């Protein structure tokens, strides 16, 4: 950007083009980034064909493989953590919390905070079709698409399935074959059958498309 020097703005960074600014400690060039990797990464795989988002800031982990612990709501997952039912190495799956399933794609902060409180933040992973915020700590994957409410693979995962997250390979996979389970899946009853949230659930697009309504 550029501001005209006669517009009342003194000679500062704001009055010059970015190419003329030599002290680049804040806005770095591609050749000299602040860190070698960004704060988030997009993964794809058999568990997230349309993609998902993993937060990398705040930890150095890039790989995790473990048995799935499946929960159909944030509340059920939170209770399991509080009751001591989650073990080191587990991959916690929280589903039906996406844009359509929630509805609204609420934040899974309570579960991640509980995991940190139980001392499990560095030894488990969490995968959800819900979302996270900047306050989240640990190896967390959100925005899984397609979401469970739309019949995405995350809806077919069962307790004990082996789930593998590999940030370097940009993959999120489940080892088991989901095909035979497809015919057994039935969409759950909607949480709202009337009102604004019911309408929203019917209209909202996938998280991979911005969760917009048409």
Describe each model-derived feature in a short phrase:
Residues 91-104:
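Glycine-rich phosphate/diphosphate-binding loops and the adjacent beta-loop-alpha structural elements
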Residues 21-63:
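Active-site loops and adjacent core secondary-structure elements that bind or stabilize anionic groups
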